[in-house]
Amino acid sequence: MKHFIHLLLILTILLPVHARGLSFDPNLIISDNDFFNKNDMSSEEIQRFLQKKGSALAEHTTTNSQGQNYSAADAIWNAANTYHLNPKVLLVLLQKEQSLIENPQPTKDSLDWATGYGVC
């Protein structure tokens, strides 16, 4: 019995473990339904996410052409709804292009070129 336990222990350690997760398809990173789900996050949820990440965008406000101030979270939400995109897609883009989600002190250039397209 003792030899059987040792053999079982050795086989358990030496045999490769096969992961039983979902397989990755490089041609389908995100589904169309997820990508275009504009209602996935509210403006308030975006704001909480930015605050949780310590993003400078959590405190960033800007003024629109009518002279109204609005938050970065509102800007993200409005863009997502206008263009029928998941707000998470825009959050990923902001992080990918200028690290604006996790950067507590972005430069003016980083903000101006937030999504890879500049404000000139």
Sequence positions of predicted segments:
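Hydrophobic h-region of N-terminal signal peptides that target proteins for export
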Residues: 11-18
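Short, functionally critical alpha-helical segments immediately adjacent to catalytic or ligand/cofactor-binding
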Residues: 74-101
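Sec-dependent signal peptide recognition
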Residues: 2-10
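Short, solvent-exposed loop/turn and secondary-structure capping segments
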Residues: 20-21, 103-108
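N-terminal export signals and maturation junctions of secreted/periplasmic proteins
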Residues: 19-73
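Long, contiguous hydrophobic alpha-helical segments, chiefly transmembrane helices and signal peptides
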Residues: 46, 90-96, 115-117
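Substrate-binding/active-site groove segments that recognize
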Residues: 107-120
